[in-house]
Amino acid sequence: MADNMDFKDLMADEAEDIIEKDIARVNQASEDIDQENQSEVVDDTTENEDASEEVYEEDTASEDGSKEKKSFFKKKEKKDKKDEKIDELTDRLMRNMAEFENFRKRTEKEKTQMFEVGAKDIIERILPVIDNFERGLAAVSVEEKDSAFVQGIEKIYKQLVTTLEAAGVKQIEAAGKEFDPDFHNAVMHAEDEEYGENIVAEEFQKGYMYRETVVRHSMVKVVN
């Protein structure tokens, strides 16, 4: 179980590295566009200064206009390619982030399931100890109930039950409740006018739940 969790953590680290690299690519592409724009501003300024210092004839002005148009479309084409690259990297980044988020949720769910399976196994091993405490305390005579030994055993029992309750373990209600096969295990049926039909008349062994999962069904007698 520990090896599996280490592998999941390693995969999460690798996913984070991929996302960080994609973010760096997007930032680099943005910086390239800023530098290109700054270069265009410098070029335009230089061209304007040169134009103000010289006097061109009509044919020269026409030729310069043609060059400016070619330069404009060339710069626009470069900018469009950079925008496409940024869009491509941004899309890839968003996909990787979505995949990582799904991976993280799936990993957390698997960790929770693994923890609950392990906790349920431990609780199943503790329940017979609870049963023995209850049988022992039920067998104590009236004269012995006030003895220090019995009171000490009772305190240990209550402490154990309180600890389990704090961990999410709770007892299943049975006696006097309507029979529910999801929580109760009917081991005996009887006729009893005191109870209505399909009502639990007696509980032979307590049932327990861990959070929303049944650890042990209540062993009961049901009225027909």
Swiss-Prot record:
GO terms for biological process: protein folding. One of its GO terms (molecular function) is adenyl-nucleotide exchange factor activity. It is found in: Cytoplasm. Residues 27-77 are annotated as: Disordered. It comes from the Bacteria. InterPro entries: GrpE, GrpE_coiled_coil, GrpE_head. It holds the Pfam family GrpE. Participates actively in the response to hyperosmotic and heat shock by preventing the aggregation of stress-denatured proteins, in association with DnaK and GrpE. It is the nucleotide exchange factor for DnaK and may function as a thermosensor. Unfolded proteins bind initially to DnaJ; upon interaction with the DnaJ-bound protein, DnaK hydrolyzes its bound ATP, resulting in the formation of a stable complex. GrpE releases ADP from DnaK; ATP binding to DnaK triggers the release of the substrate protein, thus completing the reaction cycle. Homodimer. This is Protein GrpE. It comes from Lachnoclostridium phytofermentans (strain ATCC 700394 / DSM 18823 / ISDg). The gene is grpE.
